[in-house]
Amino acid sequence: MATGRSFAEFVKNKCYNGLYRAAENYVDSDWRSLNLYTRHVHRIGEVELVDVNIQRVYVHDLPGMRVGFDVGLELEIEVKEGDYHYDESDTCFPWIRISCEGDLSCGLDDWEITSIAPYNQKNPPLNSLSDALVPYIPFDRLEDEAAAFLKEFYPEALKVTPYGQKPVSVEPDILVKRLGLQTMTRRVREDGSVYGQLYFVDTDAEMFDAKTGTVAKQHIPGRTIVVDPQTVLLRTIGCANNTIVHECVHWVKHRKVFELEKLYNENASCISCEVVGGAASAVAEQATEMMERQANQLAPRIQMPAVSYTHLTLP
């Protein structure tokens, strides 16, 4: 799966006409709120929107496949003289902020505007997702993110057990079922360089057939984590478990990245986990590094949450 598509570019192509109409209506009714500055016009009479330019797109996470996005729109406004003693005109370039929401699963066909206001460049909207829709997770929030993950999908793992009793283990098979996923064992590559792959949609994927020594297409249902058996044979069962939890993190945290990719490439199907810790595809480096780093950091914290294990190290 090629990741790293630009949500801002998609918004520019998808929403431009609607944003233009909204800006036009706003200028007609609320241009005074823009505090237009002009050196030539003594008293503003008529104003007319000439053009708009999308300068910023800030995106934040919403439940499900919905996203909120704030568009910083630069307006080109022609200002005409309102004092009949003069015949001057000028052009102003104020910004407005148009707040929107939409559902990625329908390609933002349902997108709607929730508010419009003058843009405050000193206090821009905050991004909770990157332009590729990868969530921003600061290092000091990793434990909190892992705890929130478990609270939703495996709350018993957060239980602090009495002294002398082992904490509740996160069983990958149970976690997979709770997420509505399934696992499948297949040789992904001959050299065993791919630990696992998460398939979001049904696809005919190329897998290595150990019996024939060739690569052949096999049908993989959507919502499936494929784990290479070499992960266990050449390493440990713990490595296989970590791979499954790693892919579960991708499912919960990075589905929006996949949905955005699908809007550009309808053949996209999976995210892969390589031995080297990256994604096995031609990808945008920054987005891929963010996703893999997050999955690598969160997977062990989900399997050994701080709240359940810290007391084991205390004297």
Label each PLM-derived region with a short phrase.
Residues 1-143:
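N-terminal low-structure segments adjacent to metalloprotease catalytic domains
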Residues 138-162:
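A short, surface-exposed helix-loop junction/capping segment
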Residues 168-182:
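Zn2+-dependent metallopeptidase catalytic core
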Residues 189-243, 254-255:
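Active-site scaffold of zinc-dependent metalloenzymes
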Residues 217-226, 266-276, 303-306:
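A short mid-domain helix/strand-loop element embedded in enzyme catalytic domains
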Residues 254-286:
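Post-HEXXH active-site segment of zinc metalloproteases
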Residues 288-304:
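An active-site-proximal "capping" alpha-helix that borders the catalytic cofactor pocket
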Residues 310-315:
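Conserved small/polar residues in nucleotide/adenosyl-binding loops
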